[in-house]
Amino acid sequence: MSPALQDLSQPEGLKKTLRDEINAILQKRIMVLDGGMGTMIQREKLNEEHFRGQEFKDHARPLKGNNDILSITQPDVIYQIHKEYLLAGADIIETNTFSSTSIAQADYGLEHLAYRMNMCSAGVARKAAEEVTLQTGIKRFVAGALGPTNKTLSVSPSVERPDYRNITFDELVEAYQEQAKGLLDGGVDILLIETIFDTANAKAALFALQNLFEEKYAPRPIFISGTIVDKSGRTLSGQTGEGFVISVSHGEPLCIGLNCALGAAEMRPFIEIIGKCTTAYVLCYPNAGLPNTFGDYDETPSMMAKHLKDFAMDGLVNIVGGCCGSTPDHIREIAEAVKNCKPRVPPATAFEGHMLLSGLEPFRIGPYTNFVNIGERCNVAGSRKFAKLIMAGNYEEALCVAKVQVEMGAQVLDVNMDDGMLDGPSAMTRFCNLIASEPDIAKVPLCIDSSNFAVIEAGLKCCQGKCIVNSISLKEGEDDFLEKARKIKKYGAAMVVMAFDEEGQATETDTKIRVCTRAYHLLVKKLGFNPNDIIFDPNILTIGTGMEEHNLYAINFIHATKVIKETLPGARISGGLSNLSFSFRGMEAIREAMHGVFLYHAIKSGMDMGIVNAGNLPVYDDIHKELLQLCEDLIWNKDPEATEKLLRYAQTQGTGGKKVIQTDEWRNGPVEERLEYALVKGIEKHIIEDTEEARLNQKKYPRPLNIIEGPLMNGMKIVGDLFGAGKMFLPQVIKSARVMKKAVGHLIPFMEKEREETRVLNGTVEEEDPYQGTIVLATVKGDVHDIGKNIVGVVLGCNNFRVIDLGVMTPCDKILKAALDHKADIIGLSGLITPSLDEMIFVAKEMERLAIRIPLLIGGATTSKTHTAVKIAPRYSAPVIHVLDASKSVVVCSQLLDENLKDEYFEEIMEEYEDIRQDHYESLKERRYLPLSQARKSGFQMDWLSEPHPVKPTFIGTQVFEDYDLQKLVDYIDWKPFFDVWQLRGKYPNRGFPKIFNDKTVGGEARKVYDDAHNMLNTLISQKKLRARGVVGFWPAQSIQDDIHLYAEAAVPQAAEPIATFYGLRQQAEKDSASTEPYYCLSDFIAPLHSGIRDYLGLFAVACFGVEELSKAYEDDGDDYSSIMVKALGDRLAEAFAEELHERVRRELWAYCGSEQLDVADLRRLRYKGIRPAPGYPSQPDHTEKLTMWRLADIEQSTGIRLTESLAMAPASAVSGLYFSNLKSKYFAVGKISKDQVEDYALRKNISVAEVEKWLGPILGYDTD
């Protein structure tokens, strides 16, 4: 029987009992939360009728997938799931109410049932908890789950309208209030606000709960769980973990933590951060690992339990459980793993004595924080420019004012919309919403500034961070003051209190102190307001007015500040600085000097922050001495003539300013500075003349080599340092390299002449080496991909390494010979395709055999740190290091060649790689695989007789496409991989194309590279410098078990021999016990031979020709940038060719989707029917299947695309694959396979097991060594 939830006679007792009871348990042990509800519901395989039940059998909309309705239509199913989790060891179960708000239920037309759904769900959970409590004698608790809803307050659903929102704060509060009522009436013990991807939504939920607790419901313990979406450590709306904690701490949660989106391993650093910044208990319920390529969760119960036990052993958690993909099996093992672990001990205080604010990022104001600049220019009353923009409705331009304030150093941004001609609440809402769309601005907290409390509330309802309210006062009496303060506390904001009471504005020192002291005690004693969230403004008033009574205003503020800080612990002091100098408006130099002097003294007395024009504050010591003394006299009232003297000073000094520096002013510097500037900025225009000028200075640079070793290398060192610090980007570095090559190219003839003269004179030439070291780079034998390698070469060259680039398809003996001939310090190997991994192992073995003891670097798309540590490093006794990308290569090479660092660095690498090997071998033991026979039985099943029969292609055989129109392909280019080549990656919310252009860090450079790409594309296409060729083919096909047999057009498959066979690999890694996913193989999507239904399979191969020749020409001309650009564009055109041709196949050539109407964005999201998997990729990882394609369609003869010995395609800008028309076909990853499938596959292909293991090495689920 559920407790009396609306019993108001003893609300404090109920609160105390529940909170204290849970608190007592948490102090003794780690509690366990349940696992995924959706995961378990999927296991039940419920259909539409189950979801509808009898009550909703005639409902107008489909209900399948609306899991929450099952608490009404299938309560026994939900009850049983709850009970399984409880018996598995869960102390707390969550109600089945993740989407039980009227907002989320509107999608199903059931918004009117929100209250009932919550009450029923709570009742079902309550029944299960009480039954298991009686059964086991261990008290179980029910947490009412309040999900995030499917709408967000911080992100616009419209790209074109960043200020638009499809939900309001008040609507969310109403929805959460209705949901919470149902949960409370149904008997929950805890209210859990979970899976928070937008903190503003969570703040609305907290507001709703507080409303209920104030009305009639006894308070319940509140748990809050956020969701960090990726390794950036931010929520979907862009807030950091600490920012999130600060934003919701006003809700006084008993527990706070994270769930969903990440697995335990990925979640750990963010749980650690949260634990360090909260005094609440910490809860953690991650997913069962990260979702794989197809959305499944692969982490086994034991793996997940191990991770969470590590959390517990390290004192990070108080409550653990599971989210997506987790089951009672996971919870059972987790409960067992943590049962003897000590719980985390929450700190007694977190950032004691600090004012904690947040925008997207946290901002802490502590005892040692310097003066805080609150940007003043976003104020219609204080900035004519801003007011003009807002009045004209030009909010986007007004946003630039805010951005400049932040860039100039504002740590908090004041926003004021108080003007009689404005709709204040609407203007505040629109502008705050726009700020939320700009991460560079939204990272700082806002100060919502208005004399109209309705405007203040409008602003608070838009902000996910913790704001400052500016301001309230005792002007209208205590009741009004306390009512507003109570609301501010409920919104979770700090606030400014003006020194203003019923008698008016405080101007004298004693009055300021008295008013502020009275307000402080009202807030702290009556409302329990955190003293650290109180800011007093003792009124900065105007001086220099000519009125004697105003002369002491500055002194009174400074003296009052000192006393307030000494007597009111925790409180801060702020003020509006521009008021001080209002008498001197129009004289900006005077005003700024007055502000600088005033702040110098006010800060000494304890002023913490001020509303200032960030960036326009002079340093006290930098103010002209005469002006400084005049300001001192005025502020301290030392001279009755101070105002007049300041005015006279302004008239004699004028209002001039510095001239704007002209663009080419750098040309006026010495030649060394010009050379360095040109290198850093990538400016080619003057490089030859400047290099020649330096060469002609024989006194300073007697030899051409001196110029290289001096100003040129100095410039490139700056480039390298900036790149390493993330202040320069790859395209810029490559442009710098292009300038360097031109300069060196100019000097080479002079150096060769000098060398020849020395040889004639002395008979020999002493070689001099200005480089840090020599590095041999090569793409290994059989592989033709080299963009990444070339970029690494350029970056290393920019950092004073000599790079010997051997190109592509480089055999081992050539690599080793070059290393010996050039006395290389390091060898770097690159590869894109999986067979290249074996070639890298071979090179390492040969280096060991020949006793070549120099470091070996491994890189390329197919490589990984794990493969390097497990498969390559053990074969070679010198350092073997995996290098992720160009930006890491310089650091690695520098440490390997530093005599003082290299030994220690190598030891660290050896230890790290040994740990990786141990983890790898342990994971092999933990992985479980279905026997192949069982995996086949659990494969994807289709009712071929009832499904629509396969469509016959418009032709059988092949069709070749010569000289394909490149212009048609431009719109199909996917630009994201293009930017990846240049290592340009935007941060949330500016990831991907075209949003990357908005990114503050890389956006400008991305736009330049994109423009360069389009210019080059236009040239390549208009001048026909590239050619595209391809082939498409179709044949009758039938599946037999895991293989696909192809037949001649006239053949009867049941009686004929196949003309070709494509061999398939099937998923074997055991899936979660709750998963209903089949174990896929590509053959599942082709009609079986025994079905009697005729099916078809297609194939294609396309390529862009001429890329290598153009790239080489650019390289020979010293233009690395264009060399890399043309290769990147060649790859994009080839992929675009594959995309466009597949569209034609679906609509015309095979015509199984003749009416398809998809745009390019839809194609990228894979919204088309059918698939085009490629051999060597996840759905069929075996590259040898290409041999069958090439033979069947005579691809090399018809297109010129050939296969290397490692089965890479040449040219490198090529794509090939198979076409499946089955409307239910999907992309999947085969994943790891076990030995029985390898043996079976070898037998079917009639090759040795060893040969199969060679080609399938990366997906083997066992160790072959």
UniProtKB/Swiss-Prot annotation:
EC top class named in words: transferase
Entry GO CC: cytosol
Domain AdoMet activation residues, every copy: 923-1265
CDD domains assigned to the protein according to its UniProt record, in alphabetical order: methionine_synthase_B12_BD, MeTr
Stretches assigned to the B12-binding N-terminal domain: 662-759
Chief subcellular location: cytoplasm
Positions bound to Zn(2+): C260, C323, C324
Domains (record comment): Modular enzyme with four functionally distinct domains. The isolated Hcy-binding domain catalyzes methyl transfer from free methylcobalamin to homocysteine. The Hcy-binding domain in association with the pterin-binding domain catalyzes the methylation of cob(I)alamin by methyltetrahydrofolate and the methylation of homocysteine. The B12-binding domain binds the cofactor. The AdoMet activation domain binds S-adenosyl-L-methionine. Under aerobic conditions cob(I)alamin can be converted to inactive cob(II)alamin.
Record's protein name: Methionine synthase
